Amino acid sequence: MGASCIKENSAETINPQKPVIIRAKTSKDEMKIFKSKMISLHNELRRKYNSPDLLEDNNLNIEADEYADNILLNEPQKSNVYANGLYGENIIVIDKKEETTIFNKWADEEKNFDFTKKKYSKDASHFTQIIWKETRNIGIGFSYDVFNKIYCIVVLYNPPGNTLGEFEMNISK
């Protein structure tokens, strides 16, 4: 009989063939700093495009954590976020949890957006979600897979952006 793994901070047994995920790799203080920096980076870019600052939403943080867990477990459909599609999202799976690197991967998509046409572009969708004017709240979550040594960072936005037909009023330069 194979060994089973315990998800840290719970009594839930995880199938040993699946990734082993934890949040304890980062302390609460480190996570608070990470979230604060990510929100600051978002708001700095949003101000450049005349979008109001985002406010952190603890309920979205919880949803984002759950979604990150399920993504690393290859079960995103088990997340309420995946099922209901109520939020915008930016997601990355990466080996280092460095705010600026993560954020810049999304923000650098600005070069792919045509500000004259203001239409949805898959190649700029992370960027346009970040600066979407109607979005007011943000939630940030993550999971760490100790076996594969990767993080899943999930950023949720409410209300969601990238709504077809609404680019003209939500994106400005």
PLM regions and their residue ranges:
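Short, well-ordered surface patches within globular domains
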Residues: 20-87
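Short clusters of hydrophobic/aromatic residues that line enzyme substrate/ligand-binding pockets
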Residues: 54, 91, 130
